[in-house]
Structures are given as C-alpha cells and as structure tokens.
C-alpha cells in the first residue's frame, strides 16, 4: 500500500481511466477506490476521471468513504492519455501525498509521471509496465 493507515496522509488523488475499454470493469475499479479510501483513510480522496483529457473530478471527505462506491460518477469514454492528468494536477496546483492510477494499462504512450509517490492499479493486464512507482495487478474475475 502507498501509505500505512497510521500515517497522516493529506489528500490522495485516484486517477481513474475512463477509456472505452474500461466500462466493463467499473465494478472492480469502484471496489478498489472504496478499499483505498477506507484502508488508507486520507484527509480527502480526489477522484479524477480521464481518457484522452480530464473529463471530471469528485472530491470525497472521510465521512463519505463508507458510501463512496455509490457516489462515484465516471465521465469520459475516449482514448487513454495519462499525461492529461499530470498536466491537470499541475494546472490546479494540487499537492497530493500520492497518486493512485487505476487503468487497464492500454495507454497512448504518454508516461503519466507525477512528482509524488505513485501506485498503478492495473486491471486484467499482466504486460503493463508502470512508468514510475509500483504496480499492483488487479483481476476482475
């Protein structure tokens, strides 16, 4: 895990791929978002929905973590360019303690390198190599 639950974590960004290939695995992804929020217990979880651009974001506070799965509203459905998230985080001047990427790993070639610790949760793709940080394999079955 990116953080131990006893650490003061500040805000955590979860960057969720919403490209067309992700739709069928949203239940798995939503479960991972809920587990991350509840287990890490950061000061806030900012979910950024992205495909070839950032399509939306949602900010959740600790009192919402136990129902976060039902509150998630993904938007997008186009290509897959993680660099748009990096640029978005910089333009908004967000200072997260870490970024968790949730994706199937079929990216456009841009790297998605952030200036904070990164964890890549990759669904149903054993061949993906993260551009930075650690990779966790997630299986939808």
Over which residues does each language-model region extend?
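Von Willebrand factor
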Residues: 6-64, 72, 84-103, 107, ...
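VWA/integrin I-like adhesion module and closely mimicked acidic/polar interface patches used
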Residues: 106-141
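Short, surface-exposed, polar/charged, turn-prone segments marking secondary-structure boundaries
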Residues: 41-44, 74-78, 127-130
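Short, small-residue-biased leader/transition segments that mark boundaries at the very start
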Residues: 1-2
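Acidic, Ser/Thr-rich peripheral helices and adjacent loops at domain boundaries
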Residues: 58-82, 136-141
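Glycine-centered flexibility sites
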Residues: 20, 78-79, 105, 133
């Amino acid at each position: 895990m990116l953080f131990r639950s006893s650490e003061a974590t500040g805000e955590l960004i979860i960057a969720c791929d919403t490209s067309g290939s992700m739709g069928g695995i949203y239940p798995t992804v939503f479960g991972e978002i809920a587990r991350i929020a509840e287990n890490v217990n950061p000061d806030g979880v900012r979910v950024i929905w992205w495909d070839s651009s950032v399509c939306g974001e949602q900010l959740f506070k600790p009192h919402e973590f136990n129902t976060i799965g039902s509150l998630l509203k993904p938007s997008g459905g186009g290509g897959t360019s993680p660099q748009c998230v990096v640029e978005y985080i910089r333009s908004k001047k967000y200072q997260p303690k870490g970024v968790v990427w949730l994706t199937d790993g079929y990216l456009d070639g841009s790297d998605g390198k952030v200036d904070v610790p990164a964890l890549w949760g990759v669904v149903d793709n054993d061949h993906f190599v993260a551009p930075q940080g650690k990779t966790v394999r997630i299986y939808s079955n």
